[in-house]
From Swiss-Prot:
GO cellular component: host cell cytoplasm; host cell nucleus
Role played: Plays a role in viral genome replication by driving entry of quiescent cells into the cell cycle. Stimulation of progression from G1 to S phase allows the virus to efficiently use the cellular DNA replicating machinery to achieve viral genome replication. E7 protein has both transforming and trans-activating activities. Induces the disassembly of the E2F1 transcription factor from RB1, with subsequent transcriptional activation of E2F1-regulated S-phase genes. Interferes with host histone deacetylation mediated by HDAC1 and HDAC2, leading to transcription activation.
Region of interest (E7 terminal domain), ranges: 1-42
Pfam families: E7 (PF00527)
Keyword list, A-Z: Activator, DNA-binding, Early protein, G1/S host cell cycle checkpoint dysregulation by virus, Host cytoplasm, Host nucleus, Host-virus interaction, Inhibition of host innate immune response by virus, Inhibition of host interferon signaling pathway by virus, Interferon antiviral system evasion, Metal-binding, Modulation of host cell cycle by virus, Oncogene, Transcription, Transcription regulation, Viral immunoevasion, Zinc, Zinc-finger
Family: Belongs to the papillomaviridae E7 protein family.
Protein name as catalogued: Protein E7
Keyword Metal-binding listed: yes
Amino acid sequence: MIGKEATIPDIVLELQELVQPTDLHCYEELSEEETEEEPRFIPYKIVVPCCFCDSKLRLIVVATPFGIRSQQDLLLEEVKLVCPGCREKLRHV
């Protein structure tokens, strides 16, 4: 630097000395504990009324915790079950 004020070439030269190359490779390794587990299937007993005659219907399912919550939402809102007796009546309509 010559003179009282720094010029742009002087500043750029000073910055170039500070720039360090950065290694962008990831050397991280996952341990066995961090690997994703298989979803656990748990047996559940579902008891719901027939949508026509209110007789109890029992279902045994095997599901993940997420799966059983999804099934519950369906049975409470979008899907209704029909007993075998009412199914026969529907078949003849």
